[in-house]
Regions:
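Proline/Glycine/Serine-rich low-complexity intrinsically disordered segments
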Residues: 1-157
Length: 157
């Protein structure tokens, strides 16, 4: 399965992270509901039970034990916990990367500085550029999937 439009999703048990009962659910929960895939969805709290170790791992453990057939999970969580399961699990990005204009599945991470701090921003940009191989190595060690940008975006003024 590589797409939220894959017909198999209508027949398998799907684990999805849910945020709460206020309608502010995860993009995968909304995307599946838009496709009328709801009867075979099992919800797992994004927050988990912090009285237990690694509460966000429950959804990945459910795939490993067969409690669900597939899970649609944020990439860093999926990759990190999939690596420690007793059975081999495969983590693949799903498409589309944006289900609707307001429902992204890919998220940028940014670093902000105060207005007028151009020298500080330039220093941080240079450090990040210089340390990019180290940052990528650490992300690889933790199994964090990434979508590479063609080039860094310009700063917002």
């Amino acid at each position: 399965m590589r797409s939220l439009d894959d017909p198999i999703l209508r027949t398998v048990k799907i684990g999805v992270q849910l945020i709460g009962n206020d309608g502010a659910n995860s993009p995968p929960a909304h995307a599946l509901a838009r496709r009328h895939i709801i009867e075979n969805v099992v919800g797992y709290s994004v927050y988990g039970d912090y009285a237990q170790p690694n509460p966000t791992a429950r959804i990945i453990e459910a795939v490993a034990t067969g409690a669900v057939d597939v899970a649609v999970v944020w990439g860093p969580i999926a990759s990190y916990f999939a690596r420690s399961q007793p059975v081999p699990l495969v983590v693949v990005p799903v498409t589309p990367s944006r289900d609707t204009p307001t429902l992204p599945f890919v998220f940028d991470i940014a670093l902000g500085v105060r207005r007028g701090e151009e020298a500080f921003r330039a220093e941080l940009d240079a450090i990040l550029q210089r340390r990019r191989p180290d940052i990528n190595r650490i992300l690889d060690e933790y199994g964090v999937p990434r979508v590479e940008m063609s080039e860094p975006r310009s700063a917002v003024q």
